[in-house]
Amino acid sequence: MTTTTTQRDLPKPEFTDAEAGAREFPDSNARRFSYYTPQKRKQSHYEDVTVEVQPDPRHYLSQGWLYGFSDGRGGYPLDWTALKAWGSDRPEPERFPGSGGRGYDWPATGWHEFRDPNEEWELTLYRYNANVVRQINANIDTARETKAFEQWNRNWVTFVERNIGAWMHVEHGLGLYLFANANRRAPTNMHNNAISVNSMHRIRTAQDLALYNLTLSEEIESFDGAAHIEAWNSDPAWQGVRKTAEQLTGIDDWCEAIFAANVVFEPLVGELFRSHLVQQAAPGNGDFITPTIVGAGEYDFAQRDLRYTIAMFELLTNDREFADHNKAILDQWLAVWVPRAISASRALLPLWSQPDFKPPRFEDGLDRAKSRFGGILTQLSLAEPKELTQ
């Protein structure tokens, strides 16, 4: 018996030249892009993967924002901060049939001129954080093998279980509720990347301290891994820091949040605690491990997070259209946050007397912190507020 197979008549593919890569046009085979002006003579890899990834209907995106909020506004409104960059007051171009959909020439507003000097994007974040965690783990493993934790005296164990753990709450709160929130509200992808990396530095540091707390609970028999909760909730020395940190997380203006945290709080409170207390007192009390954990977070701020912050606000204080406006706003923020930071710093004074081996005097450390803070303000062309003398 013979069976016959019926030939099926399938539609033949028709190429319409609508598929990606079908058309040839000037620069269609280029490996670099020309829709923006690079900061330097040549475009960098960082700029190619960052600039205009977040669109702006003032430049292109002629159909407007693809999504919006319940109040009718779409995308990333520029009034989410009181600061302004040149071009901010220009309305979005009106698009209508026959207009050609043309927006303002690049960069449309001064916000797009910001470049993170750290050139942060996804790859750099993963690589950097992985290297830090790898080094911290190696340090802790070495300390375990050499029984280094046995060299700690009792007072230092108490100091670490209460105060290093308490600082973990600061890192977690600011990372998750201040920087992550500010990242979503910033108007360009260059800002988004820099701020989100700042957020992840904070969250990673909080995680480092939490895991370190668990390690110490295993390695030191008398170590109370829950003592930091009581210190954070009720120790008078920490209530100023706690109050200020919680106030920081409640800031609505994303520029104010970054400015208050990185320009005011960190130099006057964070570096005072980490550099002028923990790093100074730990070696004399037999602890050479804690400074490596705390120092990783200190390096994040001093060498990376502060660097992009200065670049971001320096651009605004020298803006060709709104420099005076921005300086006036920043002076107002300084008048609010400097007294709070100084008050939080002074509340930490009792911690300086707790270790057996004492760090340099509290007032000396605070003077250095104030000097550092003044240097940052000078870079931003801002005057020191009178509140700094408190």
Model-predicted regions and their roles:
Residues 66-68, 154-186, 252-280:
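Alpha-helical bundle segments that constitute or directly flank the non-heme di-iron/ferroxidase center
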Residues 1-169, 319-390:
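Terminal targeting/low-complexity segments that flank the catalytic cores of oxidoreductases
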Residues 106, 110-113, 159-163, 187-203, ...:
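Alpha-helical scaffold segments that form or flank carboxylate-/histidine-based iron centers
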Residues 194-215, 268, 297-312, 340:
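Alpha-helical scaffold segments in carbohydrate-active enzymes
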